[in-house]
Amino acid sequence: MSAASGNREIHRFPTDGTTDLAALIPALGLVPGTDSFVLLEGEGWGASVLAFEPERHLVVDEDASPFEALRDSLACIPEDVHPLEGGSGLFGYLSYDAARHLEKLPTIAEDDLRLPISQFILPRYTVGVRGNEMWVSVPAGEKPEPIFRMFERASPLLRRSPDPVSEVRSSMGSDGYERAVKTIKEYIRAGDVFQVNVAQRFEVPFEGDRISLYGALRSVNPSPYGGMLSFPGFAAISSSPELLVRLSGRTASTRPIAGTYPRGEEVNGLLLDPKERAEHTMILDLERNDLGRAAAYGTVRVEELMTTETYSHVTHIVSEIAGQLAPEKDAVDLLAAMFPGGTITGCPKVRCMEIIEELEPVRRSLYTGSFGCLGKNSMDMNIIIRTILLKAGVAYAQAGGGIVADSIPAREYRESVAKAAALLECLGASPP
């Protein structure tokens, strides 16, 4: 079955529910780190989508605003169905440093990866799977048969055991991380902040197959907002559990995660832990305020309060907040209001970002930024955590946690390592 939507034709057909879009990447001849494509996978997205062969490629360096660039690009896109349903849209990422175009921040940490702060593509083709339905979206007038033929060439992803890695380097180490926690607690006692999220970066050599690595991570740590980004010079594979912001019609929502126990510890203990509840409550208030900057007055509400979600190595406390977008606001206004996520900065957000810049020795780059897709009146963007960045023969994995007044430095260090454990395991490395 086919249908026209704006300037595109969407061809739908039934499938047996086992179609693997990641396996289609090599069949299409796409090379991670060379070709530009975006894969979104996980039940949180509502569909798995592969977007490729850019008609336009938006690359923004630090001297230009990625938010204005997005607004200009969206102005050229027709009102259409959601990009996750085959409509026109932009697929890509904002790095954490895109926040420098929202707030005046110091420049202290080393920008050693030197990646663009934002890249989005307007794809010529998208392929999507939802349940037992598959669709191929092509420009109006084009036939989908060439893409259909590629499915016949797709082979299942093979799970290869990684070669063991003897050395894992950390940007901070246990001593440095614990010193950072102690410094944050001093800022809290002085009344500067209530909570700060601090992170460390692990790196290991990696020359393996990137598609296989993605398959391994997806198997070890399945997640609702995962996927793969590929742009010239680097790739990123993600098992993110967290939604930054969604816009569907005029309904805006966010789903913050704050509060973590290692998997295997008592879930009720997590929900009753004063430190974890305090962390979550502060972030919940921050996210309500952020959403309120773009929502119509009086519409912001908590839809779900302090439930738990369990992943391969950790259990989190999660809530959901929603509101109606104000009449004078658009998707980019909403994204700017929510960015970067409060769960990965702390409260109050701007002062926390200043402290993060002071304490973390290297820039976060993609980590704690956001990737996903935007349409004319729709948006789904995650938070880039539980993600491996691959560049020039090195794999980078970052993890951290929220520090509050009664945080215990050694425990916070162990929590950050637990969050990185699934990533390091896929790389053949043992947590330090």
Task: Please give the residue ranges for each predicted region.
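Extended alpha-helical targeting/anchoring segments
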Residues: 1-432
